[in-house]
A protein has these predicted regions:
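Residue-level signal for the nucleotide or nucleotide-sugar donor/cofactor binding architecture
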Residues: 9, 37, 76, 154, ...
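NAD(P)-dependent short-chain dehydrogenase/reductase
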Residues: 86-89, 110, 116-201
Length: 202
């Protein structure tokens, strides 16, 4: 890409990710402090920048915290997702990719359920966009797609740091079921999956 917009509501995270790119002269980086739940900010971003692709990774993803704070979890994971989709649709952004989770499959907790609803929101906008394209083939219509992750090693939402801490303290390791099986991918594998989702979405 020529320009990469980093929209992040956590000041420290935005500072650190911006610093990772600071020596990259091939891409212009624009750090933007704010939330995808801010309608006025989204409109400003889309008016001032030619946005082609949105990777929507904003979500509360720690299961116990969302379980204890369901209203905030739903606002962030569901309502803000709907607002982003509405604005992306309105501005005819080419592609919007939702970063979802395997916990959205037959969800057993509020976090998983909120991500499943976010997926359904994307599906609704995808169907509406496809209908508009069918009615007017020359119209620029957005493509809504999604990708589901399992556990990503080294990510902020991974269970691995918890396991490491429990092992360092002599155990035991907290498992939800004795027969539980967990699948992991690395950050580079996850990044490649997201890029493939963007490339394959039509």
């Amino acid at each position: 890409p020529k320009v990469l917009l980093l929209l992040e509501n956590n000041e420290a995270n935005l500072y650190f990710i911006n610093n990772e790119f600071i020596n990259n002269k091939n891409i212009e980086i624009k750090p933007i402090l704010g939330s995808c739940g801010n309608k006025l900010l989204l409109e400003k971003i889309f008016k001032e920048n030619k946005v082609d692709i949105i990777f929507h990774a904003a979500a509360y993803k720690h299961v116990p915290l969302v379980q204890e704070n369901p209203i905030e979890g739903i606002i962030n994971n569901v309502l803000n997702t709907r607002l982003l989709c509405e604005e992306a649709y309105k501005f005819s952004i080419k592609k919007i990719i939702l970063i979802s989770t395997d916990k959205a499959v037959r969800p057993t907790n509020i976090m998983g359920a909120s991500k499943r609803v976010a997926e359904q929101i994307f599906q609704c906008f995808s169907e509406e966009s496809a209908l508009q394209k069918k009615e007017n083939p020359k119209k620029d219509c957005s493509i809504f797609s999604m990708v589901r992750f399992g556990n990503v090693l080294g990510s902020s939402g991974s269970v691995v740091p918890l396991f490491q801490k429990q092992i360092d303290q002599g155990g035991p390791i907290t498992l939800t079921h004795p027969d539980i099986v967990r699948f992991f991918m690395t950050i580079p594998e996850a990044a490649e999956l997201v890029i493939q989702a963007a490339a394959m979405s039509e």
